[in-house]
């Protein structure tokens, strides 16, 4: 299976880069992983609603340029479906059984995802109603994908 993660913004912190490298290495035995970083737009401190919408649209356009027609797109969104780790593992497995071999996870910037990206998505996933830094979230997503593959294969890891 091919898994692509499209994320707004570059990882800045060394510890996050190391975690992404570690999970990427672990995942290499289960899937082909591709991580795409798109430029995040600077949000002024007192941005108006209109300015925030324009920023989301710009970031959304950059995301959409990286999405191909054959990709099954999973948008990470606060209004998405919440799954347990086991359900998430089953979800990925079921997609593979149905012939979906190109999964793409999309992580928005600090303002979230544009309506165009959400419309293009095939599924909306929510990890929690809490807000997480989008850079840290990339590591959390990779960990859950790795955990999902371990569960799928009946391998020790999931507790």
Swiss-Prot record:
Subcellular location(s): the record lists: Cytoplasm
Keywords, comma-separated and alphabetical:
Cytoplasm, Methyltransferase, rRNA processing, S-adenosyl-L-methionine, Transferase
- Give a Gene Ontology cellular component term annotated to this protein: cytoplasm
List the EC numbers from the record. 2.1.1.177
Query: Which reactions fall under this protein's catalytic activity?
Result: pseudouridine(1915) in 23S rRNA + S-adenosyl-L-methionine = N(3)-methylpseudouridine(1915) in 23S rRNA + S-adenosyl-L-homocysteine + H(+)
Q: Kindly list the GO molecular function terms attached to this UniProt entry.
A: rRNA (pseudouridine-N3-)-methyltransferase activity
Top-rank taxon of the source lineage equals Bacteria
Pfam families reported in the protein's UniProt record: SPOUT_MTase
Which residues are listed for S-adenosyl-L-methionine binding in this entry?
Answer: 76, 108, 127-132
User: Which purpose does this protein serve, as stated in its record?
Assistant: Specifically methylates the pseudouridine at position 1915 (m3Psi1915) in 23S rRNA.
Q: How does it assemble?
A: Homodimer.
What PANTHER family does the record point to?
METHYLTRANSFERASE, RIBOSOMAL RNA LARGE SUBUNIT METHYLTRANSFERASE H
| Protein family (similarity comment) | Belongs to the RNA methyltransferase RlmH family.
Q: What is this protein called?
A: Ribosomal RNA large subunit methyltransferase H
From which source organism is this entry?
Clostridium tetani (strain Massachusetts / E88)
Q: Which gene encodes it?
A: rlmH
């Amino acid at each position: 299976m091919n898994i692509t993660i499209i994320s707004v913004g570059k990882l800045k912190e060394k510890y996050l880069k190391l975690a992404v490298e570690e999970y990427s290495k672990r995942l290499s035995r289960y899937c082909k992983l591709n991580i795409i970083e798109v430029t995040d737009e600077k949000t002024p401190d007192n941005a108006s609603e209109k300015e925030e919408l324009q920023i989301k649209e710009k970031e959304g356009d950059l995301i959409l340029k990286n999405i191909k027609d054959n990709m099954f797109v999973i948008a990470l969104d606060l209004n998405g479906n919440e799954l347990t780790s086991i359900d998430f593992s089953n979800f990925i497995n079921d997609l593979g059984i149905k012939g979906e071999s190109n999964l793409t996870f999309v992580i928005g910037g600090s303002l979230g995802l544009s309506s165009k990206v959400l419309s293009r998505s095939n599924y909306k996933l929510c990890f929690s109603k809490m807000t997480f830094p989008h850079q840290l979230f990339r590591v959390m997503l990779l960990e859950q994908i790795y955990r999902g593959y371990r569960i799928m294969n009946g391998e020790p890891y999931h507790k």
